[in-house]
Amino acid sequence: MEEHIMIADVILKNKQFYILDERGKEISRKWEDELGELIGFSDVFLVFKRRDIFYSYDENFKENAHKWVSELGECKNVVGSIANFRKGEHIFTRDRFFGEISNRWV
């Protein structure tokens, strides 16, 4: 079984995003221009937006998934292993691979 390293913080420094563990130790880093805008993160994954596409990454910046903004809508929040997106009059709860878990009317 693969050990999961908890994401405790993400910082932008010298045009690089750094993922830190609970001790403040660097887990990984990647250039800002490769990732785009940080939308949100949890202890499990991160969501970035670049050129109208949302990207989900793990703690090593390995891509979990990507989907068009037009397909997902607006990212409301990222918590645990889920992210909530608002599209039209619906809120979609999605996993870290952007698979739909549930949806509800706003």
Language model features by range: what are they?
Residues 30-41, 45-47, 67-84, 105-106:
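Residue-level detector of conserved, function-critical positions
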Residues 2-12, 18, 42-50, 54-55, ...:
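Short beta-strand elements that form the blades of beta-propeller/WD-repeat-like
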Residues 16-32, 55-69, 92-106:
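Surface-exposed loop/turn elements that mediate protein-protein interactions on large endomembrane-trafficking
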Residues 2-9, 26-37:
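Beta-strand-rich domains and repeat architectures in extracellular enzymes and scaffolds
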